[in-house]
From Swiss-Prot:
Gene3D superfamilies recorded: Ankyrin repeat-containing domain
Motif mapping: FLCV motif: 227-230
Family: Belongs to the asfivirus A238L family.
Keyword Ubl conjugation: yes
Any one Gene Ontology cellular component term annotated for this protein: host cell nucleus
Lineage of origin: Viruses, Varidnaviria, Bamfordvirae, Nucleocytoviricota, Pokkesviricetes
Protein name (record): IkB-like protein
SUPFAM superfamilies: Ankyrin repeat
Each ANK repeat, start to end: 47-76, 86-119, 123-152, 157-186
Free-text note regarding domains: The C-terminal region contains the docking motifs PxIxITxC and FLCV, which are required and sufficient for binding to host calcineurin.
Function statement: IkB-like protein that inhibits the binding of NF-kappa-B to DNA, thereby downregulating pro-inflammatory cytokine production. Forms a heterodimer with the NF-kappa-B subunit RELA/p65 and prevents the activation of the NF-kappa-B transcription factor. Inhibits calcineurin function, which is required for the induction of nuclear factor of activated T cells (NFAT)-dependent immune response genes. Prevents the binding of substrates to calcineurin without affecting the phosphatase activity.
An annotated GO BP: symbiont-mediated suppression of host NF-kappaB cascade
Length: 238
């Protein structure tokens, strides 16, 4: 008697096989499968991650450029809003990556079609929050440029992207957003006034939160090594 596999198991095995070829950069094989079945990009594994998501996760910009040339208009075949079992879209994964050029490529392409940049996962975490958690300042800037709202709050803590940057201790990100990019971004973050200084008995500078609403102080963990939260400082920063 012929052994029959459940349909979902066959789907998982197939996507897993395609995923390996994406990871290895086998674009020629992928092109052949795409020509046979363009909807392959939306097929998912057992975790709900689509083939398009895995292309983004592995950072295969050559695969992306191939796909974008196949569509008559953005979103004709590729569904950028498809989410995995945790509610994450491809943009959530791209926001965490170091190479912001891949994120720019996707945003620049789907931005023509009004892609929802602020789509949250099931915990209310948006792509720009993911970028803040990982300290990806260029990714944050790209997402905001294409319409992401850095003041949107998650469902559990009520944190914005800026709160997450401070909470996770990404000192360089906070410094960068407040100083290097002060003009375009400071309007989004009115609760904080930041001063950076070197303490003689510390190797690294501290970021001092010197001006914000009282309820924000409760969000900052005391054990965070990069941030101190005080209401008043003397001229020596103590």
């Amino acid at each position: 008697m012929e052994h029959m596999f459940p349909e979902n198991q066959i789907e998982n095995l197939f996507v897993g096989w395609i995923k390996k070829h994406i990871r290895n950069g086998n674009l020629t094989l992928f092109e052949e499968f795409f020509k046979t079945d363009p909807w392959i990009v939306n097929r998912c594994d057992k975790n709900g991650s689509s083939v398009f998501m895995w292309i983004c996760i592995y950072g295969r910009i050559d695969f992306l450029k191939f796909l974008f040339k196949q569509e008559s208009y953005p979103g004709e075949i590729i569904n950028p809003h498809r989410r995995d079992k945790d509610g994450n879209s491809a943009l959530h994964y791209l926001a965490e990556k170091k190479n912001h050029l891949i994120l720019e490529e996707v945003l620049g392409y789907f931005g023509k079609n009004g892609t929802r940049i602020c789509l949250p996962n099931f915990n209310g975490i948006t792509p720009v929050m993911k970028a803040a958690m990982r300290g990806r300042s260029l990714n944050m800037l790209s997402l905001i440029k294409f319409g992401a709202d850095p003041t949107q709050k998650d469902y559990h803590r009520g944190f914005t992207a800026w709160d997450w940057a401070v909470f996770t201790g990404n000192m360089e990100l906070v410094k960068s957003l407040n100083h290097d990019y002060q003009k375009p971004l400071y309007m989004h973050f009115p609760l904080y006034k930041l001063d950076v200084f070197h303490r003689w008995f510390k190797k690294k500078p501290k970021i001092i939160i010197t001006g914000c609403k009282n309820n924000v102080y409760e969000k900052l963990p005391e054990q965070n090594p990069n941030f101190l939260c005080v209401k008043k400082l003397n001229k020596y920063g103590k």
